[in-house]
């Protein structure tokens, strides 16, 4: 059993792996890269170079194959350290090919592209593109069938559409249980949905607070569910908390809330393409996610939603369709009647019956290209690599802390859970007061791209699709110099 494989096994058991005394060397990092069976996927992506990050105008130069190999001596060829896939994934090389095919199709056959495709194109006819992307996303989120997935809109729009169907407050049950720090757009959606129903957010929102380490335990969540078992209508949590990187126990929390009559939805913005999901088997009522982070669909790319099959049924036994209430539109109509222009809405069975408008074929093209890369591997294999990559990152960060002078306040602490099964790829570093600007400037100057959350948090995400153990080692050299300088 290789060093890499043994670490995967240990981490999947929820344990911390042992690293050798030479772990903090380039040679050891490269040895892990050599054992990585997914390392070739890096060549599927365009990694910005140190030179390209400094661009001020278009010049027709796209960072290419040189930016994906080993480091060379010039900024023009040296790939940056791209640890920000939790904010925007790197561009798959397939995107340019797919977009060029789409533009040629539109130019060549015009409106016929809705129903026809060119024989050597990687794309389906436009009317089938959303369903095709849903089919390619089903395994990523653990749907039992592609019919449980719909690709449409963007995340917050989908959150509104799902809440229109699943948040049905009554005088008795009207509260929404949330975590302490939802992403602001989610928070705005929750507030506005409550107000839309004529309710007061102050009375209808239950906010769960974390402990002093910013950790929200499963026990605290279950206790809150019990406390509001009679008046909560909806539990809506992130699968991974965007600020701390904590991964919640989705199956346990879902089951517990549903047993008390509470509908359960999940915002999986930081889960989809990052951790293994089994939404159907976990009996999740609904979920939403974006595709521009770990799924690499491009800035603002089309988002996804999951609706469990039990909520997507269309009953025709009474001669007219009976289905779960929703905000309806023509593109949610069954394809067999979609172009009949009838007044009676007959939805497509499943999640795709929640569509409203004709989706952008251009946006779907970018996502289709990104998903074509995902479909060459599995979430199990990606998660296995991510576990080791993040554990190695954690180990080297701990070594930096151990090297600090005795008695000196640590320059940072990791606020992401140390349990590998309670986090994804991201590690959030809470910097000592006064360090953020200096560290951020040093990282930028040395070609490191990661996410900064003021006042003091840096989110580091070495995603497994295109990041290397060598990148982690190089990041540590730059980061330690920055906090010491």
UniProtKB/Swiss-Prot annotation:
Modified residues (N6-(pyridoxal phosphate)lysine): 293
Substrates-to-products reaction catalysed: L-kynurenine + H2O = anthranilate + L-alanine + H(+); 3-hydroxy-L-kynurenine + H2O = 3-hydroxyanthranilate + L-alanine + H(+)
GO molecular-function terms, A-Z: kynureninase activity; pyridoxal phosphate binding
Tagged with keyword Transmembrane: no
Compartment annotation: Cytoplasm
GO annotation terms (biological process): 'de novo' NAD biosynthetic process from L-tryptophan; anthranilate metabolic process; L-kynurenine catabolic process; L-tryptophan catabolic process to kynurenine; quinolinate biosynthetic process
Taxonomic superkingdom: Eukaryota
Pathway: Amino-acid degradation; L-kynurenine degradation; L-alanine and anthranilate from L-kynurenine: step 1/1; Cofactor biosynthesis; NAD(+) biosynthesis; quinolinate from L-kynurenine: step 2/3
Broadest EC class assigned to this enzyme: hydrolase
Cofactor(s) this protein requires: pyridoxal 5'-phosphate
Matches recorded under PANTHER family: KYNURENINASE (PTHR14084), KYNURENINASE 2 (PTHR14084:SF2)
UniProt family annotation: Belongs to the kynureninase family.
Function in brief: Catalyzes the cleavage of L-kynurenine (L-Kyn) and L-3-hydroxykynurenine (L-3OHKyn) into anthranilic acid (AA) and 3-hydroxyanthranilic acid (3-OHAA), respectively.
Subunit structure: Homodimer.
Protein name, as recorded: Kynureninase 1
Recorded name of the encoding gene: kyn-1
């Amino acid at each position: 059993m290789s060093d890499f494989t043994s670490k995967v096994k240990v981490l999947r058991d929820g344990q911390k792996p042992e690293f050798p005394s030479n772990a903090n060397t380039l040679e050891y990092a490269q040895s892990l890269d050599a054992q990585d069976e997914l390392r070739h996927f890096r060549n599927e992506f365009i990694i910005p170079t140190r030179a390209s990050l400094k661009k001020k105008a278009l010049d027709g130069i796209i960072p290419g194959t040189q930016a994906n190999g080993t480091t060379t001596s010039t900024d023009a060829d040296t790939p940056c350290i791209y640890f920000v896939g939790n904010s925007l994934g790197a561009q798959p090389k397939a995107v340019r090919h797919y977009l060029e095919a789409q533009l040629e199709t539109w130019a060549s056959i015009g409106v016929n592209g809705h129903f026809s495709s060119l024989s050597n194109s990687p794309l389906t006819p436009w009317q089938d593109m959303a369903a095709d992307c849903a089919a390619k996303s089903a395994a990523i989120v653990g749907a039992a069938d592609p019919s449980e997935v719909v690709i449409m809109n963007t995340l917050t729009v989908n959150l509104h559409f799902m809440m229109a169907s699943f948040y049905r407050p009554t005088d008795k049950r009207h509260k929404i249980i949330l975590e302490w720090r939802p992403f602001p757009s989610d928070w705005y959606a929750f507030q506005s949905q409550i107000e839309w129903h004529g309710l007061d957010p102050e009375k209808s929102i239950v906010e769960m607070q974390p402990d002093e380490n910013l950790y929200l335990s499963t026990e605290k969540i279950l206790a809150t569910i019990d406390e509001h078992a009679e008046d909560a209508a909806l539990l809506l949590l992130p699968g991974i908390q965007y600020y701390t990187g904590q991964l919640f126990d989705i199956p346990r929390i879902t089951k517990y809330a549903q047993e008390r009559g509470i509908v359960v939805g999940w915002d999986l913005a930081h889960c989809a393409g990052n951790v293994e999901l089994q939404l159907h088997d976990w009996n999740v009522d609904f979920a939403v996610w974006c595709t521009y982070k770990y799924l690499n669909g491009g800035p603002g790319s089309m988002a996804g939603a999951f609706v469990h099959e039990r909520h997507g049924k269309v009953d025709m036994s009474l001669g007219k369709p009976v289905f779960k209430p929703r905000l309806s539109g023509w593109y949610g109509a069954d394809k067999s009647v979609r172009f009949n222009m009838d007044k009676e809405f007959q939805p497509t069975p499943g999640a795709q019956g929640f569509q409203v408008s004709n989706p952008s074929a251009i946006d779907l093209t970018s996502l289709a290209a990104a998903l074509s890369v995902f479909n060459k591997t599995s979430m199990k294999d990606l998660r296995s690599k991510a576990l080791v990559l993040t554990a190695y990152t954690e180990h080297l960060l701990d070594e930096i802390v151990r090297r600090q002078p005795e008695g000196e306040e640590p320059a940072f602490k990791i606020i992401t859970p140390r349990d590998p099964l309670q986090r994804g790829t991201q590690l959030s570093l809470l910097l000592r007061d006064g360090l953020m600007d200096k560290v951020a400037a040093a990282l930028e100057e040395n070609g490191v791209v990661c996410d900064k959350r003021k006042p003091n948090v840096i989110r580091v995400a070495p995603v497994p699709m295109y990041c290397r153990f060598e990148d982690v080692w190089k990041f540590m050299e730059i980061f330690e110099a920055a906090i010491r300088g």
